[in-house]
Design a protein with these regions (language model features):
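Conserved SAM-binding strand-loop segment of SAM-dependent methyltransferases
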Residues: 164-177
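N-terminal juxtadomain amphipathic helix
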Residues: 14-100
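A conserved beta-strand element that flanks and buttresses the S-adenosyl-L-methionine
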Residues: 188
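A short glycine-rich, Lys/Arg-flanked "PGG" loop and its adjoining helix->strand segment in the class I
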Residues: 200-215
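Short, glycine-/aromatic-enriched active-site segment of Class I SAM-dependent methyltransferases
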Residues: 51, 218-238
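Conserved SAM-binding motif I beta-strand of class I
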Residues: 146-151
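Conserved class I S-adenosyl-L-methionine
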Residues: 121-131
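Conserved SAM-binding loop of SAM-dependent methyltransferases across substrates and taxa
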Residues: 132-144
Length: 238
């Protein structure tokens, strides 16, 4: 009975919606496993982000867009975890189209090179969820040779490789670890954890790819800023 766990007390669903919900609803915290999550906001049923249809009356799958809060570890998370293959097999958003993104990663690359004393010839840099290579391109332009993107979307990995930014096409998961070169001096993960249902596995994989003295940099949304800015439009299935 989906109505029991929904912000709206009773929601009637058909058999297809029922099967969809049962396959992707999350009853435990992705971070700590706590099963007593609190619903803080419901934005109704929504399609996947960037789900562009060819016809106005064309049907698409809708998922409840809700945020759950864990009072044990304070992690905020969506109530459902959509099959990642549906979301990332062919991803429509290319990060390089954003001028602010490009500028951010140029500034970030310069800062990381200085702070961590990275060497153009020796330092090995991995970007997880690398999209079209936007975060690695500044390193490439500065002469870094050992860079690697990890990107699940085939179209984006193909685009990055076409632009001479070496990219592995696949998810960061244990089954793919043997296919990715290890001992990275720097691993970047920008807005990646928000897209994954397997936080612990992904974190474990990152540490296995990292060299003994390497650095892992994670960028995620900050709840306090979301509340201050009322940026509820940053909540979506992606």
């Amino acid at each position: 009975n989906y109505g029991v766990t929904h912000t709206i007390r009773h929601v009637l669903v058909n058999d297809n919606e029922k099967d969809l919900l049962l396959s992707c609803y999350k009853f435990d915290c992705r971070s700590c496993g706590n099963t007593k999550l609190k619903r803080v906001i419901s934005l109704g049923y929504q399609p996947l982000a960037n789900n562009l249809l060819n016809k106005k009356d064309e049907k698409c799958e809708l998922y409840p867009l809700e945020v759950n809060y864990c009072d044990r570890c304070h992690n905020c998370q969506l109530s459902v975890a959509v099959n990642p293959k549906k979301m990332f097999s062919n991803y429509l958003y290319t990060s390089s189209t954003s001028k602010s993104f490009r500028e951010h990663f140029v500034n970030a690359a310069n800062k990381y090179i200085k702070d961590f004393k990275l060497n153009k010839k020796k330092s090995y840099i991995i970007d997880i969820g690398s999209n079209d290579g936007v975060a690695l391109k500044p390193f490439k332009n500065l002469g870094f040779k050992k860079i690697l993107g990890v990107e699940p979307a085939k179209n984006l990995a193909k685009l990055a490789n076409k632009n001479k930014i070496k990219t592995f096409n696949g998810f960061l998961e244990k089954s793919n670890l043997s296919k990715i070169k290890k001992d990275a001096d720097l691993i970047l993960a920008s807005n990646v954890f928000a897209h994954s249902d397997k936080l612990k596995e992904m974190a474990e994989c990152m540490f296995k790819l990292l060299s003994k003295n390497g650095t892992l940099i994670i960028e995620v949304q900050y709840l306090l800023n979301t509340l201050k800015d009322l940026s509820f439009d940053n909540i979506y299935h992606e």
